[in-house]
Amino acid sequence: MQEPSAWREALSEIIGDPAERERIANEVGVRSITLARWANGSSLPRPQNLRHLLNALPKQHRSHMQELLEEAFSDLATIEVEHGEEEISSKFIMEVFDIRATIADQLRFWTISRHVLQKALRQLDPEQVGMAITVVRCMPPSSNGKILSLRESVGLGSPPWGGDLEEKALFLGAESLAGYAVTTCRPAPIQNLQEDRTFLPAYQTENEVSSIAYPIMFASRIAGCLLISSTEPNYFLSQSRTSLIQGYTNLVGLAFEPEEFYPPEIIQLRMMPDLETQRTYFTNFRQRVLALLRGTGPEQSLNTAQAELRAWQQLEEALLQL
């Protein structure tokens, strides 16, 4: 029998090449320093990461590494048949359908979105490297029948982002990565916002290094996108990871009403002001909502959700006039 440290020695040799170490780390979903700690014995991989590690290794090393890991970890065979990073469990999918079937209409969007984002954050960032996931919604069509902007809504993050990102929501337009994904109805990844200056318009915020926007579609119509940011470069290179993101995006789509999906031809996004400019307008948002709820005339029968949407429309109109 091999010594328990044999798998660490083998891993140390494999990750001796810095480029290969970085590639494997990206595939596993951890920092490259984490791989080094596994190799030198200062930390132990979580059970779910053992399978990811095997899949990320070059083919010529997998069989030998699997033998070493099976000797060091008696439960490796059990881990091998469990769902990996690239899969969403059928149990969780049924949970989402159950919520959709039983939740009240006015709570459906928030409840489903938050439930899916909580699970996605745990599965996509198990090591809490740093990730933010936000549901970005199309604003309703303006008076000319066109959709001119998008709005961030439900959002969750792991450190260095705050847990609940909904209070930090802002408008996004043609200048943003989300805007590009919604306009083209195609996924839009940027692997390094500090280096990538291609045609993709990135809306870079604090801590964000790589990002992906995945369109939320139904019957060839679009409702917005799922916007995910990571503190790590190249975080969205892994095909299994992007497939997982697609699955979570489809589940988020269940939070929307059919009429919230719009024909792509009416998407005509405008440029939106920067974050600091927008924040000055958001300070009185609650006052706007209360004024609409207390209003008379055509606005007097609004419920809270309707008043909030009307307040967002007022803010959108004001920002587009700047």
Show which residues each predicted segment covers:
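A short, Lys/Arg-rich alpha-helix, primarily the initiator
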Residues: M1-E27
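DNA major-groove recognition helix of helix-turn-helix/homeodomain DNA-binding modules
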Residues: P47-E67
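Regulatory sensory and allosteric helical modules in signal-transduction proteins
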Residues: R137-F199
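Helix-to-coil/beta transition segments that act as allosteric "coupling" elements at the rims
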Residues: A174, F199-A223
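Regulatory loop-to-helix N-cap segments in sensory/regulatory domains
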Residues: S230-I245, E259, P263
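Allosteric cytosolic regulatory segments
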Residues: I245-G253
